[in-house]
Amino acid sequence: MVSPAKPVVCIVTPGTKSANNGNWRTAARWAEMLRDRFKVIVQSEWDGTHCDAMIALHARRSATSIARFAANRASPALAVVLTGTDLYRDLPRHLEVPRSLDAARRIVVLQEEALRSLQARWRRKARVVLQSATPLRTVRKTRIALHCVAVGHLRPEKDPRTLFAAMRLIPHELPITLRHIGAPLDAALARQAKALAKQDSRYRYSGALSHGLTRAAIQSAHLLVHPSAIEGGANVISEAVMSGTAIVASRIAGNIGLLGRSYPGYFEAGDASGLARRLVQAWKDVNYRKRLQKACTARKAALSPAGERRALRNLLAEMLS
């Protein structure tokens, strides 16, 4: 007996494997999760290949593929995934974003708080897919220093300037270090990172690393520091949680939607002194570190691969029914 052909799903992402950015890693992870039930194609722009459903990451940058797929289809099996720049910058500025949302059968957001940014007509067809990470064992960490890691390409949305300023505010006698991982996409920010590394041995700029090396760095750190100004729902948050690494993060919707409103590790976005205080507190107060760790551990079930896979399958079942 011949098995029925698997439905074909095209995942469109403006990211590329060589760029090693969040869009690409999301697309690659989702493709792997879906391949047991679907034939999955990943493209940077849809080339017209037959597909039964499309999942398009980035409403603005994938707008051409979205419009072409939706054309001449009364009810396309089309899901548009909203990134942080879509939600918190481009939605009110670029007509392509609302057009993409209107064309979609389903809208995907990557954390619960994002629903608040959608008009009622879009919220009705929105679904939340929390990004996951493979669990890693928690490793023993030194007690004689506080080693922090920040992961994010150097660009304004990730707000590395707040990191730089915070490190300058932390007293030099405190054994607090920061390793910064991310490609130098913004030349001015890259110059600042390299200058700080020369001036302050506690700060180390590693540039872009492979995903495996980045996860190892997160796993070995005491804290992930995540100062973004705009975030749709950063997968690095999930990677830290699933590695047993606590988090200090900016109080923005993209982080609150993953960690919860009562998470004890927030500082106000752009507040370097607030970040510095959090890091000093984490070094000096072992009970505070335990509170952070407990709060992160409580998020493991929500950020597990099983939950993400289930949400994706439910999404496609709705569109293809």
Outline where the language-model segments fall.
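Short alpha-helical donor nucleotide-sugar binding micro-motif in glycosyltransferases
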Residues: 101, 208-209, 216-221
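A short, active-site helix/loop in glycosyltransferases that binds the activated sugar's phosphate group
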Residues: 102-126, 133-136
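Conserved donor-binding/catalytic core segment of Leloir-type glycosyltransferases
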Residues: 140-158, 163-169, 178-181
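Glycosyltransferase donor-sugar binding loop
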Residues: 177-191, 207-208
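Nucleotide-activated donor-binding/catalytic signature segment of Leloir-type glycosyltransferases, i.e.
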Residues: 191-209
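Aromatic "clamp/platform" in nucleotide-sugar-dependent glycosyltransferases that forms part
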Residues: 229
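Short hydrophobic beta-strand element within catalytic cores of glycosyltransferases
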Residues: 246-249
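Conserved acidic donor-binding segment of nucleotide-sugar-dependent glycosyltransferases
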Residues: 261-272, 281-286
